[in-house]
A protein has these predicted regions:
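Glycoside hydrolase catalytic-domain groove-lining segments
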Residues: 234-249, 355-397, 452-459
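Active-site groove signature of glycoside hydrolases
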Residues: 268-298, 319-328
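Aromatic- and acid-rich polysaccharide-binding/catalytic face
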Residues: 334-364, 387-393, 432-434
């Protein structure tokens, strides 16, 4: 052997010994380093986690280090039901048939190239587990909503095994009441199935063809009518001939000043009344945005709304007044509300688009159509039945020049499959069957929402509306009892369910007032209790904004006032007299 080869052999052997030494000795040294290196961990990254659709407020903040997220072991156990066992310097975390075993702070048989992922951290005496380790147990962890908000989502293996449209539905609070009066033509059980086809040239704008293709007679169709135009009697008769009743989207597009108690308004109302069938009148909708000619004038809007309501009440008692907003912005919605006595139904228009405002950087494929409904539903369904005045889903967009058929199938399936069960106060839904690439005004030719052009999308719609819960004709003689529901605006903390104080006030009919410190006083049937308030910021349904849920401990309140309740299949059911 040459001298040079001998030297290389010795050096190589030395390196091997050093590496072997690291394997045997280094973990203890790294363990010591981890204990002393907590200043490198950023704690307080987020105070919230979403797990399988439910919000959880953590007992301890989430940490972040080297692009990994760390969750405390007590919190991990609370929200995922993992089990732990400790013996000497060994810690085992298990879930179902998978387990992690830590020896002196490191997972056994872990690659040395991933030291930061293999070890856990200790902060203030608590063990913090990195997300990569939790994912070894089968969970999926990520920033909620494309990393643009500070909420972490944890999805269980069972949840991941479901189809996308069936994932993360979360829990629902149901409130069952007796002796609830119904609004005009309100179905107590079921949803009127509706659509808009007047711009679908693919089916020659035919309601009968739409009914045939979808395999279901639709109970209602709608038409846009500009204020100043006569009532569309001929079209309304076509709707009736197709087995439905009309919704008229009546829009004062020259501004609110033209709305007066004059001959035009009276004749419009008389023509509507002469039809002698239910008519859903969606007057001046989407006023909460900035894109209508009647936005930004809430006082005048309410004044004109009341005027139209009073004329309709006198001349056309068959007319249902639909006060209809757009999903967002939320902050301006309530200032336009005319009052319960002037509104029959509250509506909202919902669109699942792949990108917002034709901006490639504003990707919005994560948005859940059910969550887009939640704000209006939770705010108003305790006092008015709800209408989804328009619902559309992108299947092609010019923003990226791509077809998104799977996206459309997923969102349509999620909306129509779960709406009757989870949102019993929704009484109408209308699909917006339009290819806006052809039919929209210039500047808005962005998305194709039509469902008749592609078989997979049409089949998804047809499969989910075929149930008896979607109604094809007017229901009469509504039942006296009604089921209300409440979703999304609650969270779990320390094993307790906290619902927003507005739920306690509006849905349980309890008096809620700010009390001393961080507590609220709840009064019901002459009895009052003080309860601690816990707040949690959660993601809004769109645009990466936050909202604060001011939660009250629901179990404590129900027990204190002896309100009948039970947990069924993970949902809370409450029985309460109206």
């Amino acid at each position: 052997m040459s001298k040079r080869k001998l030297v290389l052999s010795v050096v190589t052997a030395f390196i091997i010994v050093c590496l072997f030494g690291i394997v045997i000795i280094e973990p203890a040294e790294i363990w010591s380093r981890i204990k002393q290196n907590n200043e490198g961990m950023k704690v307080g990254y987020s105070d919230s986690v979403v797990y399988d659709g439910n919000h959880y407020k953590l007992l301890h903040p989430i940490g972040e280090k080297n692009e990994s997220r760390y969750i405390s072991l007590p919190d991990l156990k609370a929200i995922t039901s993992v089990e732990t066992a400790e013996k000497d310097e060994e810690l085992t975390i298990s879930y179902k048939n998978k387990k992690l075993t830590y020896d002196n702070g490191f997972i056994q048989n872990c690659s040395l190239t991933k030291d930061d992922m293999c070890g856990y951290e200790i902060i203030d005496g608590l063990i913090y587990i990195p997300d990569q380790s939790v994912e070894r147990l089968g969970f999926q962890i990520g920033f909620f909503y494309d990393k643009q908000t500070n909420t972490v989502s944890i999805k269980s293996p069972e949840e991941q095994a479901k189809k996308p449209q069936d994932q993360e539905l979360g829990s629902t609070i149901y409130v069952h009441k007796e002796n609830v009066p119904a609004e005009k033509y309100e179905p107590r059980s079921g949803i009127y199935l509706g659509g808009y086809v007047l711009q679908d040239e693919y089916i020659d704008t035919s309601m009968n063809t739409f009914n045939k293709l979808t395999g279901k007679t639709h109970a209602s169709y709608f038409k846009y009518v500009g204020y100043g135009k006569p009532f569309p009697k001929e079209w309304a008769e076509e709707v009736i001939a197709a087995g439905g009743f009309p919704q008229v989207a009546w829009e004062p597009n020259n501004g609110l000043n033209e709305v007066k108690d004059d001959e035009y308004l009276r004749q419009f109302a008389k023509d509507a009344g002469e039809l002698n069938v239910p008519i859903l009148l969606r007057y001046a909708s989407e006023m909460n945005g900035t894109w209508t000619f009647y936005s930004g004038h809430s006082e005048q809007y309410i004044e004109k709304w009341k005027l139209v309501h009073d004329v309709m009440e006198k001349e056309a008692p068959n007319v249902m007044m639909l006060w209809n907003v757009f999903t967002m912005p939320e902050s301006t919605i309530d200032e336009f509300y005319p009052g319960d006595e002037y509104v029959d139904y509250v509506g909202v228009n919902i669109y699942n688009v792949f990108y917002h405002n034709d901006k490639i950087e504003a990707k919005s494929d994560f948005e859940d159509p059910l969550r887009l409904l939640d704000y209006v539903y939770n705010t108003y369904s305790h006092k008015k039945p709800i209408v989804i005045g328009e619902f559309g889903v992108t299947n092609y967009t010019v923003t990226d020049g791509q077809h998104h058929d799977d996206f459309a199938v997923e969102k349509i399936t999620r909306m129509y499959k779960y709406l009757p069960e989870l949102y019993p106060r929704v009484k109408f839904i209308y699909y917006f069957d339009v290819n806006n690439l052809v039919n929209a005004p210039e500047g808005r030719k962005i998305n194709n929402y039509a469902i008749t052009e592609k078989k997979s999308i049409l089949n998804a719609y047809a499969a989910n509306v075929k149930t008896d819960q979607y109604l094809s004709k007017v229901e009469g003689d509504p039942a006296k009892s009604e089921t209300y529901s409440y979703r999304d605006f609650f969270f779990y903390y320390g094993g307790e369910l906290y619902a927003d104080y507005k739920f306690v006030r509006d849905y349980l009919n309890m008096d809620v007032k700010e009390s001393r410190g961080n507590s609220m006083k709840v009064t019901f049937n002459g009895k009052g209790i003080d309860v601690k308030q816990e707040s949690l910021k959660i993601d809004k349904a769109a645009f990466f904004e936050k909202r604060e849920v001011k939660g009250l401990p629901l179990g404590e309140i129900l027990d204190a006032f002896e309100v009948e309740n039970e947990i069924k299949d993970g949902d809370l059911h409450i029985q309460i007299a109206k």
